[in-house]
Amino acid sequence: MADVPHVPSVMTADELHETVATIVALQQPSGMIPWFVGGHCDPWNHVETAMALDIAGLHTRAELAYQWLVDTQSPQGWWHNYYMPSGAVSDHKIDSNVCAYIAAGVWHHWLHTSDRAFVEHVWPTVKSAVNFVVSMARHDGTILWAQHPGERPWDFALLTGSSSIAHSLRCACHIAALLRHDHTNWSNALERLEHVIRNDVSAFEPKLRWAMDWYYPVLAGVVTGDAAANMLNDRWDEFVIPGKGVRCVHDEPWVTAAETAECALSLSAIGETERARELLECTRLHRDVDGAYWTGIVYPQVIRFPVGERSAYTSAAVILAAESIAGDTMASRLFWADDHPMHV
């Protein structure tokens, strides 16, 4: 059994394996991992769950998950937003952030396995996806959110999605450097995107209600140091319910375990490890008896919402945060703001 993160009061090593078993149970023969039984799969959260498989040492299953992305990618480099286990497309939208995230997942896989042959195998897929995403960049550095197949991209960008894209672009540059490929165009796109995120939030569609717009520039390693700490502290009381976790939106008492885990990951990324652990401990309230995690809880009634939903991506987010807090592998540094490891 592989060594896995062990974070007392959050998730023991044995509990992590229990949680990953609930993700494995969802994985289809094709490699696809839907949100829940009978649910859809989106490529972003699919990558998140693949990373959880790698953390548990299930590298063959993680590679099967990435192979599903190889097999379903369009010739233009994109994926649709939602797929069903049958292979049918349930949402045809093309989301730039969804398409970019494979780079973060593949870099994470490399940090766990040092399997150069696998990275070379998926390189054409990563390259095509990242080139597509960069093609959606505007002159100001922002990257347009989405489009429908064959249509022009929508004319606005999102702060959360763009921050995640910045992290994915950084990972893509690491992969390119590992394989000795030129990545000048990607590096330039990353520099422009980071500049606008740090200096002109008005360039993005306002989504101030949403917790992800609050912490994602920190999680993605775009805003760092004192500025990152200030960003998290400034709206902490708006989004965090003490002892419960992070609200999905600041004006509703709906706490989601994934947002709680991602916010904890943001704290870990800037070195606030103990504060991250304390926040991630709140996700224990979402843990079910078999190790799966309920997506959200509404307070004070303690109503699980969406009703009956235990999502694989939620479990994966908790595992990723636990890995970062444990900090005992190179892969745990994936989101660390001051440590973007090349190791080529």
Positions of PLM-derived features:
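Well-ordered alpha-helical scaffold segments within catalytic/enzyme domains
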Residues: 1-9, 47-61, 101-118, 163-180, ...
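Short, surface-exposed loop/turn segments at secondary-structure junctions
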Residues: 34-37, 116-120, 180-184
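Active-site neighborhood of glycoside hydrolase catalytic domains
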Residues: 159-200
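N-terminal beta1-alpha1-beta2 module of alpha/beta enzyme domains
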Residues: 26, 35, 39-47, 51, ...
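Extended glycan-interaction surfaces of carbohydrate-active proteins
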Residues: 2-40, 63-95, 99, 123, ...
